[in-house]
Every structure is written in structure tokens, then in C-alpha cells.
Amino acid sequence: EILARAPEHQVQPSLERVEAVLDLLGNPERTYRTVHITGTNGKTSTARMTERLLAAGGMRTGRFTSPHLATIRERISLDGEPISEEGFIAAWEDVAPYVAMVDERSQAAGGPRLSFFEVLAVMALAAFADYPVDVAVIEVGLGGRWDATNVIGSDVAVITPIGRDHERWLGSSITEIAHEKAGIIKDGSTVIVAHQVPEAAAEIEQAAVSHRAVVRRERDPQEDPTSPEAGVLQVLDRQLAVGGQLVTFATAAAVYEDAFLPLHGEYQAHNALLALAAAEAVHG
């Protein structure tokens, strides 16, 4: 039933179907905090690290990511582990009657059924409430503004580096793509922003200002660090280590010296910086 639905890359510019199902379920997505992650590169790695940091702080966590590698259950994680087969079936059985109601209503009005990705998003949001989690880390499937996950009222948004991707659906320019991805920014939220090309940075800044959001931005290596406009997030140092790297991070809250990151690659250090800043924002 789930796999027979429209594939996740078929984006309909509407959140109405997902919102309608969640409303019938009693809005489970409002019972826990959320970190919403978009961008072009590094979303899943950043999501996983954010979840690990939040769990290390004593929080019960959920994570929704895509695509999956071996089993569809990987997309919905509870306390760092894929949801069990029993849990996955229970989540589907919980939402199925309401999905059917909204499908029928939508088709009667000439619209589509919920897509594969929309159903999985609803299942995840319901499963997180049922578990229950304290915080869920939610990765956007495609874009942001019209992504099924954008029904959440996240108080922390993370935007990883933006490049050209899914141009058929998001637009042919970096400005257009950034506009769609910045659509996850909510009123009064905190936005963690990776170093971006100028066109993307300008679009994100405009969205943040319009939503009165607090921006914690990764510093451009060419920026004057004494400038009040300079980003506050920075990878200060990296050293190779057995099984990974030692990284010194600077955030709005502190400098973390020689933190061991069990992953290789400079890009993973920058993903970890975003995750650290997101976890700080959740913990306040």
C-alpha cells in the first residue's frame, strides 16, 4: 500500500494533505521539539550527529531521514535505532484510516492521494509522539517550502551548503533553490547556517529577517573576525587521528578543543559544527 503510492520526487506544492491527516490524529507533531534540516550536501550526516549530541545530553530522540539503504525502517529512528518491524507496522495501522479519509477527500476534489513520502512523514511524526521522544531531528526530503516535513513548527532550523539540485522541481538558479530551502524557517526560530555562496546566503538572510529568526552562521574564511557581521561558527583546527580526526570548534556558546570526531574528511568536521550548534540551540 505505501510503496504503491506516488514516488517521493513528485512534489505537489501543498501541505494540505499532510496537515489534514495530522489534524485528524490530534497533531502529534506538536508534542515534542523539532530540529528541521535542509540543504544540498550533508543533511543526513548532520542529522545523525545532531541526534547523537541530543541523546548524549539525556534526551529521548527521533530521527526522520531519507533515502534508506537496506530497509525502509531506517528512515524512522527512535533513540538512534531504526524503528522495529512491529513498530513500523503499528505506525502504519495507526495512521492508515486517516490517510484513507484524506485520500478520498483529495481525490473527490480532483487532487492526488498522499504520496509515498507524505505517508512516511506522517508515520514518523505519529511514531515519535507515541514513543514518546523529547526531540525529533527531521530531514527534508526535497527542497523545504513544500516538503511534507514542513508541517512542523520547528524552533531550530539547519541549512547545510546549498548547490544546484533537483532543478526540475526547485528552480534553475541558486537563488531559487535557496528560496525554497529557506522556506523551513519559522517565526522566532534559531537558524544554523553553513557557509554558503553569496546568492544563497542573501536569500537565507532575507527569510530569517522576515521571520525574526536568530541566525548563527558559519564564518566565511575571508571574513574579518572582528566584524559584528561575522559568523560565529567556525572549525578552528583539524588534526588527523586514529579512526577519525581531532577538531576544535567555535560556536556562539563556547570553544570546544580537540573534540574527537570518528569520521574522516573536512566536510564532516563542518557537518559536526552545524550539529553542535543545533544541539546548543535546543538546549538553550
Each language-model region and where it sits:
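Charged, amphipathic alpha-helical linker segments immediately N-terminal to NTP-binding catalytic cores
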Residues: 1-9
